[in-house]
UniProtKB/Swiss-Prot annotation:
It is found in: Cytoplasm. This is 5'-nucleotidase SurE. It holds the Pfam family SurE. Nucleotidase that shows phosphatase activity on nucleoside 5'-monophosphates. Binds 1 divalent metal cation per subunit. The keyword NADP does not apply. GO terms for cellular component: cytoplasm. NCBIfam families: PRK00346.1-4, surE. It comes from the Bacteria. It catalyses: a ribonucleoside 5'-phosphate + H2O = a ribonucleoside + phosphate. Belongs to the SurE nucleotidase family. It is an enzyme of class 3 (hydrolase).
């Protein structure tokens, strides 16, 4: 089995090293095409106005000055001579749950893999801040992902569907199981910090404030709070079929077929 790895935290990210160790429990034919720099929050963006610079780091390891989407395309179309059987995107430093998935470059790696016709999974590890420092328990995903992926690798997924895997912030022996979940909902409370440069001109940082949400049972955010691994099937079709008829009637078209 040929496996292509990517991420959005960059080629030197600890989560990518963890993902390679996980992938090598499944195959010896593991390839990496990952961003040269941190691409967090760029979602499914595609570089069309700038050239892509590809750098070979070592055997089957490549860094690309581009987005996670670019990395998957380059991996399949340029780097690898044969299409991969599986794409793993991650392991992200931080969960990708609820509305996070719309911002996530990690999710985008799996989206692009799915668009390219390759079975794709996104993996993310929840963390906690302690005394202002991010503490990521990578040992959780490393302990539990190999067996979980082994169970999921051969299931029949519809075209346009991929799996989003999130691992809880706890010790490996505190994981209370695995749950198949739906996407939850969080209020992000995005904040704008205004600052001034050395010449007095303003510049801005976006940051997340305290997040809030309704942690309904059966959702990804609820599962993580229960120290459970969340497995969420996501699909590329964003159509809201429940309102098609309503929109058709408003336009005087009658009920949509």
């Amino acid at each position: 089995m040929r496996i292509l790895l990517t991420n959005d935290d960059g080629i030197h990210a600890e989560g990518l090293a963890a993902l390679e160790r996980i992938a090598r429990t499944m195959s010896d034919d593991v390839w990496i095409v990952a961003p040269e720099t941190d691409q967090s929050g760029l979602a499914h963006s595609l570089s069309l106005s700038e050239p892509l610079r590809l750098r070979k780091v070592s055997d089957k390891h490549y860094a690309l000055r581009g987005t996670p989407t670019d990395c998957v395309i380059m991996g399949i179309r340029q780097v690898m001579d044969i299409k991969p059987d599986l794409i793993l995107s991650g392991v992200n430093s931080g969960s990708n749950v609820a509305d996070d998935v719309t911002y996530s470059g990690t999710i985008a790696g799996a989206i692009e893999g799915t668009l390219q016709g390759v079975r794709s999974f996104a993996l993310s590890q929840a963390y906690v801040h302690e005394n202002g420092t991010r503490v990521v328990p990578w040992e959780v995903v490393q302990a539990h992902a190999p067996a979980l992926l082994g169970k999921l690798i051969d299931i029949d997924l519809p075209d346009g569907t991929f799996l989003n895997l999130n691992f809880p912030n706890c010790r490996p022996d505190e994981v209370s199981g695995t749950e198949v979940t739906a996407q939850g909902n969080l209020a992000f409370n995005l904040q704008v910090d205004e600052r001034a440069d050395g010449r007095g001109f303003p510049y801005y940082w976006l940051r997340f404030g305290e997040r809030s949400g309704i942690f309904r049972p059966g959702t990804d955010i609820h599962a993580l709070k229960q120290n459970r691994i969340s497995v969420t099937p996501l699909k590329l079709d964003l159509t809201d079929y429940s309102v098609q008829d309503r929109v058709a009637r408003a336009l005087g078209h009658g009920v949509a077929d």
